[in-house]
Structure formats: C-alpha cells, structure tokens
Amino acid sequence: VHGCELEKARIAGLLHDCAKCIPNPKKLSMCAKAGIVVTDFERKNPFLLHAKLGAYVAEEVYKVKDPDILSAICWHTTGKPRMTQLEQIIYIADYIEPNRYKAPNLADIRKLAFEDLDLCMYRILRDTVEYLKENPKSMDLTTEAAYRYYKRLIEEEEE
C-alpha cells in the first residue's frame, strides 16, 4: 500500500475506531484518568476523543507498542500537518470507507487515494473545511492547520 508496511496498516486499520463506541462522558473520564490532554474543543465535541483514546486503548488493552501505529490511530480523525504515510493512509481510509456516501467528491477522492496521498489529503481537508464553514460548526485547530499545510504543499508542487 503506497510502499507502507502492510502489517502496520492492517493493525492501525483494525484498531483505529476501537474507542468509538465508548459513551462521550466515559471518554472524558477515561482521558482524565489516563492523563490524555483534552482541548476545550474536544471537551465540547467529545466524539473526537475516540482517536486519542483509541491510541491509548490500542496500547493498554491490545498491547500495541509501535509508535507509528499508535500515532496513525491518534490522528485519523482530525489529521495534522506533516502526516506520515501510515497516518495518511489511515486518515484517508477512514474518510473513504464503504459506508460513507454523503461526502462531496467521494468517487474522485476514492480514486485519488490510490494515486497521490498528499493531493488526496488536501482534497479531503478542503471539502471538510468547506463543509464546516457552511454548517454552523466550529473546527478543530489541528484540522485547520492540516488543511493549511496540505494546501501549501499542493500549491508549491504546482508551481
């Protein structure tokens, strides 16, 4: 998969949502007990914590020790600037999963996922930012930073 270690991608893919079904109040209390830093935005939108908490659960419950896998799980929801190839693959795979059908440009993004990870990241983040601006929702600062990073990266490649 894009030259990425398949076993790492497999484990991260299987475990990336391992904390998703935990009720939001419990997510907050588990993060507090585990010493996981929770931003004000995450406190107001605790569903986002399933990524950070998922990395913790993967390590503590499933005994995953590989920092690359744990990081891919941690960042699969918000993204971040300068994502590793594995982080990008898990982020993109989460976005293009078969049960998703409402996202704009999904067919193009699914095709792009097999061609250019950086451009695919930019397109997903661009669509996410546009969606969040059109709807009365605020945006995680890390997602905004990721969008700016990939936008700049793609613009530099086009020059």
Language-model-derived ranges and their functions:
Residues F114, V129-E130:
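N-terminal hydrophobic signal/anchor transmembrane helix of membrane proteins
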